[in-house]
Amino acid sequence: MSNQNNQNNQILKNTNAQILDEFNASIMFDKELYAQDIKGSIAHSKMLASQGILTNEEQKAIEKGLFQVKSEIESGEFKFSLAYEDIHMAVETRLTEIIGEPGKKLHTARSRNDQVCTDFTLYVQDKTLSIKEQLKELVATFVDIASLHTTTLIPGMTHLQHAQPLNFGFHLLAYANMFKRDYERFESSFERNNYSPLGSAALAGTPHNINRELTAQTLGFTAPTLNAMDTVSNRDFALEILFNISTTMMHISRISEELILWSSYEFQFVRMSDQYATTSSIMPQKKNPDVPELLRGKTGRVYGNLISLLTVMKGLPLAYNKDTQEDKEGVFDSVKTVEISISILNEVIKTMIVNVDKMQNACKIGHLTATDLADYLVQKQNMPFRTAYYITKDVVALANSLNKDISELSIDEIRKANDELKNINEDIVLYLDLKNSMNARNSFGGTSTKQTESQIEYFKKWLENK
């Protein structure tokens, strides 16, 4: 009985050890950082050699060995295992197997605390640059399509109700502005976070005679970070990229929502390529906007990753805590999500077919030029705006009774709507014309064709300089 108990206890102990290893290890996800880990280690070894801590021969052996490790990982020859715990130990262990004793010297004047911060910062900076380029391409696509539709009318909406006539190019440029701001957020984050953690060690620096400026320069950073304790505790750079991605995905979700509406039977403003829509499994007549719906849906998981890391960080005492091992998976997931989302949205916009007639006919519903009538009465008749507002309501009521849009009323019909309009000038009809209304909004940033073309020229210059 005693032997049986001992066997059971040993099985339980082994099982618990395996569970603990799986719980504690990060290797199965932080292996994503292998390239940054090796890049940081090469820079660190060069600095150690320049300071006389390593010999030149040792440094060369380390660098050559690290390139071999990188090659083995990329070819699939290297097999990741929980035994390594994390990417740092995996690389160092394999390096030491390849080159022997010099591999054991690589970690001199370094802690995994500053090492992981360096790896993760390099990853975030790399992805910041690549996402920026994707956003630039997306802005260019919106500008290209907008340039084709500076005179195409579309109902401008507030509260999802018809409000005023716009041109479709102007509407698309609203999204170009959103994604331009996203680009600029990534751009400013890159500059703010471009400082090297390497050499901060565990939390207080190192007694070794190191040169942090050299490693910062080698790795492409602006300078070393200023405070070792803050450095190993800091995950602001990860939070920033998560916020930037969340904002970008929010903008992607908004255009996706409009694409879903515009492609519906009720709107029919655009037709998406068959590549980005699917048919129903039971209703053969349907064409479902699956891709925009997925883009809209994926926004939630990205928001979740941001909230998750904010929650991890909110109560951590200085300096390093194991909690921050939970910082990476959400970032990796959000990066991959936004990369594929931008790429797919770009193609959806490029390939959509715009139904110009449907858009322009929709402008004849909802009295989009009612505000123009009120503005006319203020400007031409010197009426107080509130008086003009109520007179315009009478004209709208008349149009409804005649089953017409206000833009379709004749001068005689307008004059019958209210006693104040009995002698109104005939040019009022021109103010109610949809295209004239759109072009009348010629203030800076407005929807007129002239202003829209000016905005397009602005974006073309912006794109040339990026």
Curated annotation (Swiss-Prot):
<keyword id="KW-0456">Lyase</keyword>
<dbReference type="Pfam" id="PF00206">
    <property type="entry name" value="Lyase_1"/>
</dbReference>
<dbReference type="GO" id="GO:0004056">
    <property type="term" value="F:argininosuccinate lyase activity"/>
</dbReference>
<keyword id="KW-0028">Amino-acid biosynthesis</keyword>
<protein>
    <recommendedName>
        <fullName>Argininosuccinate lyase</fullName>
        <ecNumber>4.3.2.1</ecNumber>
    </recommendedName>
</protein>
<dbReference type="GO" id="GO:0005829">
    <property type="term" value="C:cytosol"/>
</dbReference>
<dbReference type="InterPro" id="IPR008948">
    <property type="entry name" value="L-Aspartase-like"/>
</dbReference>
<dbReference type="InterPro" id="IPR000362">
    <property type="entry name" value="Fumarate_lyase_fam"/>
</dbReference>
<dbReference type="GO" id="GO:0042450">
    <property type="term" value="P:arginine biosynthetic process via ornithine"/>
</dbReference>
<keyword id="KW-0055">Arginine biosynthesis</keyword>
<dbReference type="GO" id="GO:0006526">
    <property type="term" value="P:L-arginine biosynthetic process"/>
</dbReference>
<dbReference type="InterPro" id="IPR024083">
    <property type="entry name" value="Fumarase/histidase_N"/>
</dbReference>
<comment type="similarity">
    <text>Belongs to the lyase 1 family. Argininosuccinate lyase subfamily.</text>
</comment>
<dbReference type="InterPro" id="IPR009049">
    <property type="entry name" value="Argininosuccinate_lyase"/>
</dbReference>
<dbReference type="InterPro" id="IPR022761">
    <property type="entry name" value="Fumarate_lyase_N"/>
</dbReference>
<dbReference type="InterPro" id="IPR029419">
    <property type="entry name" value="Arg_succ_lyase_C"/>
</dbReference>
<comment type="pathway">
    <text>Amino-acid biosynthesis; L-arginine biosynthesis; L-arginine from L-ornithine and carbamoyl phosphate: step 3/3.</text>
</comment>
<keyword id="KW-0963">Cytoplasm</keyword>
<dbReference type="Pfam" id="PF14698">
    <property type="entry name" value="ASL_C2"/>
</dbReference>
